[in-house]
């Protein structure tokens, strides 16, 4: 039996073993569809990754449009900042470092590609159409039609493994360091043996920010079989001056066969070439590190070493099974279960670990640090402070604590809390001071095992530093006037005022929890300054000049669909009208009472002013719960939005997943509660979508260990008739974090008609 057939047999036996394992107990990972979000700008990818993995192997198919017509690689085109789009049909390799559900291009580098025949170095020449895709947590496979090559990939947290099923004849494994999603260039590659290369690729400039802080990702790559030929290619830039007369390689790609010294350049790559007499399997193992080549090699050896593909896949899938089993769903609706677990899967990708196997990592100041715990990165905090961290405080408190401690380490290293941090680089993307909100919210939910005094000091620094404040531009005017004007050059002055208010409220909450009464009073008063921007003529928040005059002409609709406008960031006046979650009762009074409040909310939903695909207004469906007798509108609207935007299909997200925030919104809607007010440990109810859900909580933080959520959802009713908590009638549509976590059972009676 040849090696090709033997490998196929091993893979088949492995699949049978996993299938037997699934039949003995219900597996959670079988309900994950990694293709959800790969269309409709969801920016996810179906590649292989471990929970919180630093490395992932994703198919790279963004060099051609859906019709196969050649186009330039437009990384920011229509916000498609992802290595994979479901509609595209032309694959140019498998990238080893990626982001999931973000709105700007970066990473997407260290791209491998199996080919046959003559070696070609241009991805548009060697790329291939593909078919028979399969994806599950920790695994992806595809057939390359051009070459008749089946490819399978799997990954650990810091290393990955690809398996290429080559036909007989000339076959190649390419490693392209020129292609990628990052806006940075530059790479190094060196053969250290006939079967091993090492090198680096520069990345950075996320959202075209912090370009001066571009940094390397190091790698080591090994093939399982020694090639007949190996080498490096380098494409040279084109010169038009006199020197071009003597350059025979001007603008050409130069092949360097058996070259064993380092090659440096912008468009370089390496190849392993074989001449197989029969079909043969070649495995490629890659380890990465942001610290050094030596650490990349150690990560590879420690996490994969001599393990075979099947062992690595099963190890990672066991890790996913453990991660996703925090929630157990009992329902006959298989489709809804797949939507839910796919969301929990996507939410478990970022933030991801940033430290190597030995604990080394790159600090925010560029020095090498060491951690005995876990160092996390990819903090998309403008997005995640609204619902994401509350979910992980509940389901995965140890992970949330490590995230908080990572934020405090960033403060120690850089002098500031993170805003939108990526691989120890502050990108300063979006607005506001969101880390303060996450720190306070985590502490108020009982996760207090971090240095709260340091956190409070860090929070106050960003709120009180008047000069050279990178987190709060315009703070001096904000403190003097109570708002940011359109005259001082701060982006989205209305939106940013609101964000500063929410952060100030969080600081006040933290101050109160720590016993600082005067500071609590000060910050809570400061958090209400958005009222200076409330215009009763429109019942909306409106931009103002520094002299106190309203900005005119004022068009409340301007700014939808990412259109730039004077007052708001990624939204318009309607989408920011209710974004004061800490003062909803006060806003009701400003708007003239409950009837006008509900009327204005209905205006948003009834006239297509609501944007499900972005963060500022995603809590709005739950705001009807603040008005007695109108709670049914929340239940109706959440149900409609779930059905409209969340599907078990590639376009099954409303838009960019924003590192799991949109998935978190869906999960809360299906579970029946939502954290409507960041930095307040409360939830508000809606109708659950499953008959029974068990939340398996960490007993180190939640002694009861389990919460059961029961309902008669399968009978078709979507309106809450009654709620019971531990057998007693519960008369409020709000529940504190403490009461929810101490409950053993929450039961909903649902009906077909609203209870008004």
Regions found by a protein language model. Give the residues of each.
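Accessory carbohydrate-recognition regions in carbohydrate-active enzymes
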Residues: 21-437, 443-498, 509-532, 538-575, ...
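Bacterial Sec-dependent N-terminal signal peptides
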Residues: 1-23
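Short aromatic-glycine motifs in intrinsically disordered, low-complexity regions
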Residues: 706-715
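ATP-dependent phospho-/nucleotidyl transfer catalytic cores
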Residues: 503
């Amino acid at each position: 039996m040849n090696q090709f057939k033997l490998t196929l047999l091993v893979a088949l036996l492995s699949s049978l073993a996993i299938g037997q394992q699934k039949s003995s107990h219900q597996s959670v990972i079988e309900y994950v569809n990694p293709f959800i979000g790969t269309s409709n700008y969801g920016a996810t990818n179906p590649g292989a990754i471990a929970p919180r993995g630093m490395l992932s192997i994703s198919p790279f198919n963004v060099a051609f449009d859906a019709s196969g017509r050649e186009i330039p690689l437009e990384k920011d085109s229509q916000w498609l900042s992802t290595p994979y789009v479901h509609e595209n049909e032309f694959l140019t390799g498998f990238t080893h470092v990626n982001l999931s559900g973000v709105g700007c291009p970066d990473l997407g580098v260290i791209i491998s590609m199996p080919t046959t025949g003559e070696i070609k170095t241009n991805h548009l020449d060697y790329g291939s159409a593909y078919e028979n895709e399969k994806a599950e947590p920790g695994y992806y496979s595809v057939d390359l039609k051009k070459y008749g090559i089946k490819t399978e990939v799997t990954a650990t947290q810091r290393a990955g493994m690809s398996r290429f099923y080559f036909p007989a004849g000339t076959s190649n494994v390419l490693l392209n360091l020129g292609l990628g999603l990052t806006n940075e260039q530059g790479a190094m590659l060196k053969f250290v043996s006939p079967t091993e290369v090492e090198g680096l690729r520069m990345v950075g400039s996320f959202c075209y920010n912090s370009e001066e802080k571009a940094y390397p990702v190091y790698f080591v790559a090994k093939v399982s079989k020694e090639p007949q030929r190996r080498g490096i290619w380098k494409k040279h830039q084109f010169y038009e001056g006199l020197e071009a007369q003597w350059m025979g390689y001007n603008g050409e790609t130069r092949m360097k066969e058996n070259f064993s010294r380092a090659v440096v350049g912008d468009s370089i790559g390496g190849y392993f070439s074989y001449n197989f007499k029969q079909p043969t399997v070649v495995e490629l193992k890659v380890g990465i590190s942001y610290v050094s080549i030596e650490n990349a090699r150690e990560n590879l050896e420690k996490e994969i070493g001599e393990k075979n593909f099947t062992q690595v896949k099963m190890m990672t899938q066991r890790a996913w099974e453990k991660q996703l089993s925090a929630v157990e769903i009992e329902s006959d609706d298989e489709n809804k279960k797949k939507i839910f677990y796919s969301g929990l899967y996507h939410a478990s990708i970022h933030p991801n670990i940033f430290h190597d196997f030995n604990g080394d990592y790159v600090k925010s100041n560029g020095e090498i640090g060491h951690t005995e715990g876990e160092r996390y990165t990819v903090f998309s905090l403008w997005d995640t402070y609204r619902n994401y961290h509350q979910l992980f405080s509940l389901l995965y408190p140890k992970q949330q604590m490590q995230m908080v401690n990572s934020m405090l380490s960033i403060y120690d290293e850089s002098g500031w809390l993170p805003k939108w941090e990526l691989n120890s680089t502050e990108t300063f993307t979006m607005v506001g001071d969101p880390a303060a909100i996450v720190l306070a919210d985590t502490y108020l939910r009982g996760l207090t095992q971090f240095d709260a005094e340091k956190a409070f000091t860090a929070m106050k620094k960003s709120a009180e530093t008047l000069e050279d404040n990178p987190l709060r531009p315009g703070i001096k005017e904000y403190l003097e006037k109570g708002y940011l004007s359109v005259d001082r050059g701060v982006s989205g002055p209305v939106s940013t005022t609101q964000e500063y208010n929410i952060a100030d409220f969080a600081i006040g909450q933290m101050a109160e929890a720590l016993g600082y009464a005067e500071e609590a009073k000060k910050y809570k008063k400061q958090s209400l300054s958005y009222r200076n921007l409330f215009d009763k003529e429109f019942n909306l928040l409106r931009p103002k000049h520094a002299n106190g005059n309203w900005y005119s002409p004022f068009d409340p609709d301007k700014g939808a669909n990412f259109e730039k406008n004077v007052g708001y960031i990624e939204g318009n006046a309607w989408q920011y009208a209710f974004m004061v979650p800490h003062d909803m009762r006060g806003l009701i009074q400003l708007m003239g009472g409950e009837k006008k409040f509900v009327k204005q909310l209905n205006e948003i939903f009834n006239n297509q002013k609501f944007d499900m695909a972005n963060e500022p207004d995603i809590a709005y469906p739950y705001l009807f719960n603040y008005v007695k007798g109108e709670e049914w509108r929340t239940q109706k609207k959440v149900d409609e939005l779930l059905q409209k935007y969340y599907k078990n299909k590639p376009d099954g997200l409303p838009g960019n997943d924003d590192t799991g925030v949109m998935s978190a919104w869906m999960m809360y809607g299906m579970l029946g509660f939502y954290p409507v007010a960041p930095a307040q440990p409360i939830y508000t109810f809606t109708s659950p979508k499953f008959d029974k859900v068990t939340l398996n909580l960490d007993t180190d933080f939640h002694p009861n260990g389990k919460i059961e959520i029961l309902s008669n959802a399968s009978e078709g009713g979507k309106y809450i008739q009654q709620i019971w908590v531990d057998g007693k009638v519960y008369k409020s549509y709000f529940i504190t974090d403490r009461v929810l976590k101490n409950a053993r059972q929450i039961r909903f009676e649902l009906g077909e008609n609203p209870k008004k």
